[in-house]
Each structure stands twice: as C-alpha cells, then as structure tokens.
C-alpha cells in the first residue's frame, strides 16, 4: 500500500483486517494495529515494514504495510520486490504528495499493477474530481504504461470502513476493494515443482529462536527441516549451507507454524544465524542468487557513550559500556541500515540513514532503561586515497511548465 504520511494507510489495513474476520468477537481492537511499536503509535508513522494476510472468499491476500518516510526508504524498495501489485492511497483533500511519487515511481518501474484508492472522501474539504486529475497527471509524468494508466479507481473512507466504485455511491463495507484486488491483481507466477528460490526481504529477531528471515518464495517449495544453500547476488563467493528449523506463515496479526509452503507465499523461517537481507535461500542443487536493491549507505553519525556526567546513574538501569555494546549489537541484528563501530572502551560511533532514524533508536533505548550520552550528529564524508571527496549532486526537478521560471 503506497501512501504519503497520514493519508490513512495503516487505518485502511486495520479495516481490512476487521472485515476479514480475523478478530474474535470479544477481542479488544486497537486503532492502527499495524503500527505495533509505542513510538510508531505516538508519532503516527510506520517505521518498519510489516506483513499480514487476510482471506477473502477463499483467496489469500498478503498485505505489506511500508513506511512512507525517506529515512526508512531502504525498507520500501525491498518490499516492492515481494508484491504483485500496489494500492495507491491518496487523500481526497491533499492529493498526491512527494513521498507518494517516490514509491510509486519504483512500483511502476517494476511493472506492478496499480489500484487507485481515494481515501477520506467524507472530509469537508475533499476535492475528488481535482485529485483524480492530479493522479492521472502523476501517472503520465512517471511514464506509466497504458494498462497502469487505466487503473481501476475506488473511493473510500478508511475510518468508516467503506468503499465504493463511484464518488457519490454510498459505501457499505470494503467488499468493492477486496473484489478489485482479487480480480485485477495477478496471482504470483512460480512453479512449485521447480528447485527452491527465495529472496530474504526483511529480518526479525527473537530471543528464543534468533534471527528470522522473511521473504517471498519465487519458485519451488520450502519445507521444515529442509537443507538449503544461502547465496548473495553482490558477493558471488559467499555461499553457506543451512537448515530450516521452523517455518511460519503470516495469518492476520500473527505468525502460525506450518510444515511447508510453495511459490508465491510470504513466509518467515528460523534456524540460520547469518541470514540477512538480500541473501537468496536456494535448493542446494541449484544455487541461483536473485538480484536485489543494495541498501543505501548511512549519511550521518553520532557517538553514543557511557554517561560520565555528575548526574550519572540516576535515571537508567543499564549504564555500563557492556550494556550499551550488547544493546547496539542486538539492534544490528534487525536493522540493516545501521552501522556501529567501537571508539575506545566506552564509546560507539553509530551511523544511520538520517536524524529520524537515529532519534528513534535513542528514544527506544531510553525507554528500555538505558542511560547514555550522545554527541551532536555530523555528516559522513567519503575519503579516497586519503583525500576527502566533495559530494557532487545531480538534481533533476520535475515541475509543471508554469513554475519553471520560479524554480530556475
């Protein structure tokens, strides 16, 4: 689901989950259930891409909720590789926004089919006709194919949980949306009989089972206790053997254990300590790595160190450098765009994608009871042969002709 911050993406997923009956009758339902982290709920943003699955009249629909913020952009590009189509969700008053453009462009380049959903049609300042024109202009700008240009359009209010085929038709529930997804978005093509091939698109970590790899099976079938090869497209020399100890499928809000899954399914598996994003899990007799988007390098760095101020030890439970080191190493297991290097005995250089990326890590650690001091962030420079290279930026600005003069 592609949407700008606050256009109602996570709320829409909530309603899809409710209406596909994944909750028990007496279960308490929180709003924005996909934003499961405390910080995500407070800031109203999605930080990590999450997967879920709903069933509609016998068809299983895998839904992936992605972050809209550029600091977490590494998440978006990887996730697009896991899907067959996208829902472009646009606010009926604000229209398409810059972040929508970035993700939509990536989706169109991959040839994904698009379903346009205009959300918040019950807003008093909704301008549905104009927003529809803006979306068509955006698709034109991004060189959409004829088929992508003729995408079906639905009108909905995610908060009320209704969708309809026309802006004036009264909606009853989200059935029109489910029906369009099932009819319009193609089912995954993959031969379940072929040798296994699956790209790991995201990782999770659990204290009991260690690293958990998540990905979509491109072809073949994966089974519990199966012996597999792990290879890497950008590092052809890397090849390791592993065993699938446990296998899970996404069902509603949780994972449930299964014994096998075939092409097209999105699954999670554990049992391989060195599994990481971008590696391909293959059948040992045919190790063929799949290409993937390299994760962007960090842009800023901060120093995390032990609190040595006069007020040390008053707030946190974990105050030593060993506590800090263990916590940062644990974060590295699930966040691939973070880099940590040790500086002396009790300081660590932590580099990330942007200020928001690092501020969320600091705030999470503070809430967990860690006490630390941090330096101001500084921009990372790139050195070649001992010389600091100056960044060269090539900027392409797409603007309608009427603004050309102002921008130049």
Task: Please give the residue ranges for each predicted region.
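Interdomain boundary/hinge elements
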Residues: 28-31, 142-154, 188-199, 236-250, ...
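Charge-rich, low-aromatic oligomerization/scaffolding segments with amphipathic character
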Residues: 127, 279-282, 355-371, 407-408
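A short, contiguous, amphipathic alpha-helix enriched in charged residues
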Residues: 309-332
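Conserved Switch II/interswitch segment of TRAFAC-class P-loop GTPases
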Residues: 61, 66-72, 80-104, 108-130
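Canonical P-loop GTPase G-domain recognition
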Residues: 113, 123-186
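Conserved nucleotide-binding/hydrolysis modules and their immediate coupling elements
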Residues: 197-302, 312-314
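Short glycine/threonine-rich beta-strand-turn micro-motifs
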Residues: 157, 343-357
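P-loop NTPase switch module centered on the Walker A-proximal segment
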Residues: 1-90, 134, 203-206
